[in-house]
Structure formats: structure tokens, C-alpha cells
Curated annotation (Swiss-Prot):
UniProt-listed GO biological process terms: translation
Cross-referenced Pfam families: Ribosomal_L40e (PF01020), ubiquitin (PF00240)
Name listed for the protein in its UniProt record: Ubiquitin-ribosomal protein eL40 fusion protein
PANTHER family (UniProt xref): UBIQUITIN
Organism of provenance: Acanthamoeba castellanii
Family: In the N-terminal section; belongs to the ubiquitin family. In the C-terminal section; belongs to the eukaryotic ribosomal protein eL40 family.
Domain Ubiquitin-like: 1-76
Signal peptide: none
Note: Ubiquitin is encoded by 4 different genes. Uba52 and Rps27a genes code for a single copy of ubiquitin fused to the ribosomal proteins eL40 and eS31, respectively. UBB and UBC genes code for a polyubiquitin precursor with exact head to tail repeats, the number of repeats differ between species and strains.
InterPro entries the UniProt entry points to: Ribosomal_eL40_dom, Ribosomal_eL40_sf, Ubiquitin-like_dom, Ubiquitin-like_domsf, Ubiquitin_CS, Ubiquitin_dom, Ubiquitin_ubiquitin-like
Amino acid sequence: MQIFVKTLTGKTITLEVESSDTIENVKQKIQDKEGIPPDQQRLIFAGKQLEDGRTLADYNIQKESTLHLVLRLRGGVIEPSLQVLARKYNCDKVVCRKCYARLHPRAVNCRKKKCGHSNHWRPKKKLK
């Protein structure tokens, strides 16, 4: 039977499948056509995310049904060289205790008028 897979970009992929095919098999066919690894794919049908071990018949997916393909979000790990850069620009500062303005490390008074150019400041907390 033929089913359709619609991506977030609006592209529609046509797949030839059997109702006994598992979701893993469908993801493999999508990889063969589009080059998207199965571990990055999430398939949605009737508002439900489809689980790898189940079959198309388990979800009552019939001929000419449309599945929606969304990509799995990636983790937010910062590359080590970018961490060093972030520390250089963000952590060598002092913070006003009254208005929380970030100030230059050698600042004597705050630059903001709302705290009365206070001289009460603390070092900015370091990134972990």
C-alpha cells in the first residue's frame, strides 16, 4: 500500500509499505529516500508519536494515510572552544548589587542612574 509522509518544510514523500511493517522499517525507508537517520526522526499520526516496535496496523494506518515527520531536537552542549570564549566575554565582569547591571571589571561606580551610580558591586558568578 502507499502512504505519504509530510515534512515540516511542506515536502511530501511517498512510500510503498505493508500494514505489517514496523515503524522502524518506515523510518529506514525514509532514510533511504531522504538521508535522515532514523534516530533523528519522529513520526506523528492522528496526534500520536509512533513507537518503533509497533506496526502500521497497530495504529490503524491504512492506504493513502499521511504521517507527519518531525526531527528530534538536539542537545544543547557547548563546544569547549566556545565555552572558553563565553567565559572570556561574560565572566570577567562585576555586577551592581542594586540594579544588576553588568560592569567592566575595573569599574568603581555603576553606570546606571536608577541606582544612583552605586559603588556596591560584586564579581559576576562564574560558569560551571
